[in-house]
Amino acid sequence: MLIQKLASLAVLVPVALATDPIKPNRTILFHSHNDYQQPRPVYDAFDAGFRSFESDLWWDKDADKFYVSHTILTIDHSKTFQTQTLDRIMKIMEGNYSPHYTKDMPHKFLTASDNKPTSQPDWYKYYAEGFGGVRPIQLLLEIKSNDGAVSWPHLMKALDPLRERGWLTKWENGKIHYGPVIAVGTGGTPADEMAPKTSRDYFFDCPAGSLNGTVKTSSGASYPFNSTLCPMSSKSYIDVPDSNLGLLPPPPKAPTQFHREIVETHKHNSTTRFYGVLPGSLARIDDFNMLIQQGSDWISTDVMSDQCAYNRS
């Protein structure tokens, strides 16, 4: 399939590359993909205006630690989930990192008059505006060690400092209770720990464009995707037909394909993210422009300057 896609690129009519990002009419949400690979994980993206950070996690039961790395071969034992992500998030939220996030901000978020439990969450508004003038921080957590059932409890324990302060967004008594931090599991996150739960303070990165279906647990039980489970829904950019693998500007058929995926996801009140646009691709901005024009919510990128380019005042 990859070879067929690559071969098809050779017959495409060339399209001029965009010179500038478009000016969107709404706040575009930015997600720091492979954030742990930045020179200063979390901090670089936060300073650039990102409020969502991704961690690829490898559980080591002997060390009792999660390491952050894209592959098992590139694990650096000095880089753990604690040191590269959690400690930095805590420093920001406790007001010890940036003048743009003071220690009273979590309290402002939680006590804002319009921050009320709801059974019909507006996730885009939550991410784009937050409450009390404070936007939330998202942790996108991908278990890559292929042991989700074993490692998931340890990951939940690692979030205890956020949980103990009452900062985590949670699903409880049939309603979403918004917090200044939201933890979203992706990749090897076990469905058993998500869909059947009647109370939880973590969420699921659902499959964009496929929310009319169901999620299945290890027992074979099926649960419908819904907005109380899926604040974000993602899909690989190159898995959408006519994507050009993100190597060339989108051809005329691409907008229709992406629009279909986005509309279907929005019907379930989830937000959309397409990942995998190569940071070094000359067509990157064309891809992002097209996604924004079709109504996608998130831009997933490793390039810190992208956020300022689109959300400039």
Descriptions of predicted regions:
Residues 19-36, 41-54, 58-313:
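Catalytic cores of phosphodiester-bond hydrolases, prominently lipid phosphodiesterases
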Residues 1-19:
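Fungal secretory targeting signals
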